């Protein structure tokens, strides 16, 4: 378990040091946007990797393989649409994220059942959970 915690700390440090990968010339034209696109231009300094240009997303920026894709709490992030899917989760290694298409009535049922089973729900605040549990 200590190895897992060490890798989670390493993942956090790597994330803090990782630059924001922005599209080439994103600042020149607002319609382009900042979302990452790999530069392919023949004379592109960014593609070549000149030091005074923005960073290019490469394999070296990836986090540790064992903790890649996990929630910062260390749990797997599982999308849940109903109570049946929630019951199938393992609370020790998995946490729930309620789908955006779920309505309020079913959301309340899911939060109550998750509290009963000891499953963490990532996208419901503590205040909302308390409010749902009191209903």
Curated annotation (Swiss-Prot):
GO terms for cellular component: cytosolic large ribosomal subunit. One of its GO terms (molecular function) is structural constituent of ribosome. Keywords: Ribonucleoprotein, Ribosomal protein. It comes from the Archaea. GO terms for biological process: translation. The keyword Ribosomal protein applies. SMART domains: Ribosomal_L32e (SM01393). CDD domains: Ribosomal_L32_L32e (cd00513). It holds the Pfam family Ribosomal_L32e. InterPro entries: Ribosomal_eL32 (IPR001515), Ribosomal_eL32_arc (IPR023654), Ribosomal_eL32_CS (IPR018263), Ribosomal_eL32_sf (IPR036351). Belongs to the eukaryotic ribosomal protein eL32 family. This is Large ribosomal subunit protein eL32. The lineage of its organism: Archaea, Methanobacteriati, Methanobacteriota, Methanomada group, Methanococci.
